[in-house]
C-alpha cells in the first residue's frame, strides 16, 4: 500500500509540474503574493524571490526563465540565485512594466 501511495503522489506531481516541463520559456513573478494579486503577466507563475530554488525539481537547468518584480531589484536577486544554482538561461526582465513590453504580454488584473 505504501508503494502505491508513493506512486500516486509522483503521478500527481508530474501532472501538476508538466506545464513547466513543456514550455520553452517560463515567466516568474517574484513579488509578494499581495503584489501578484494586484496584477501579473499573462502566463506567469508566482514564486517569491527568496523561494526561487523551489523550481529545481521541476525546471531543467537550460530552460529560459524570465524573472520580474516591481522594480527589477528582487528579480535581479532571483537571477543571481538561479545562476549560482546552474540555471544559465535566467533573465532579469526587470519591472512588470518592462517585462510586459519585453515579452509582449498583457497584465492580468484579479
Model-derived segments and their meaning:
Residues 6-13:
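Sec-dependent signal peptide recognition
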Residues 13-22:
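Hydrophobic h-region of N-terminal signal peptides that target proteins for export
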Residues 69:
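Short cysteine clusters
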Residues 2-6, 24-26, 33-63, 73-110:
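Rhodanese-like catalytic fold shared by cysteine-dependent sulfurtransferases
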Amino acid at each position: 500500500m505504501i508503494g502505491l501511495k508513493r506512486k500516486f503522489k509522483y503521478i500527481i506531481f508530474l501532472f501538476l509540474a508538466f506545464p513547466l516541463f513543456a514550455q520553452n520559456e517560463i515567466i516568474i513573478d517574484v513579488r509578494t503574493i499581495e503584489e501578484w494579486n494586484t496584477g501579473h503577466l499573462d502566463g506567469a507563475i508566482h514564486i517569491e524571490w527568496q523561494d526561487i530554488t523551489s523550481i529545481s525539481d521541476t525546471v531543467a537547468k537550460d530552460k529560459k526563465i524570465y524573472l520580474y518584480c516591481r522594480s527589477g531589484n528582487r528579480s535581479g536577486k532571483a537571477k543571481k540565485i538561479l545562476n549560482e544554482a546552474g540555471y544559465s538561461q535566467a533573465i532579469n526582465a526587470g519591472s512588470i512594466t518592462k517585462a510586459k513590453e519585453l515579452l509582449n504580454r498583457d497584465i492580468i488584473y484579479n
